[in-house]
Design a protein with these regions (language model features):
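Ribonuclease/tRNase effector modules and their secretory precursors
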Residues: 1-121
Length: 121
């Protein structure tokens, strides 16, 4: 488990060299996970630190391949919940996180809105 201060110290030591943009809907997903007590703030920092490490690795691969790198990966929280991040690099070293959702057995966990959309279709 990583506290906020430890996360910031580690990020400063490792010098993550990219900007991260998280759209408001993904940010709201983060906030709702904390509000619903599914994750503590420390667990969110832990997941975000894992994201940063993974991004750093993917960025090195993208630079080596000289192409836009688009990918996703899974992170397991300490309480057993699993999440999937999907992100894409832009040419100006900017990272865009465009998806974050909870998974069950590798598949997206259905929410009430997903069920309503499915019924409406």
């Amino acid at each position: 488990m990583v506290s906020r201060k430890a996360f910031i110290d580690k990020a400063n030591q490792e010098c993550f060299s990219f900007n991260i943009q998280i759209p408001w809907w993904t940010y709201n997903n983060f906030k709702s996970l904390v509000w619903r007590k599914r994750l503590s703030e420390e667990q969110v920092y832990q997941i975000f630190l894992s994201l940063c490490r993974e991004v750093e690795d993917r960025q090195m691969q993208a630079v080596a391949d000289k192409r836009k790198y688009q990918t996703g990966f899974y992170v397991a929280a300490c309480n057993g919940r699993e999440f999937r991040f999907e992100f894409a690099f832009k040419k100006n070293q900017e990272l865009s996180v465009y998806n974050l959702f909870e998974t069950v057995n590798g598949r997206k966990k259905l929410t009430l809105m997903d069920l309503l959309d499915y019924i409406m279709d």
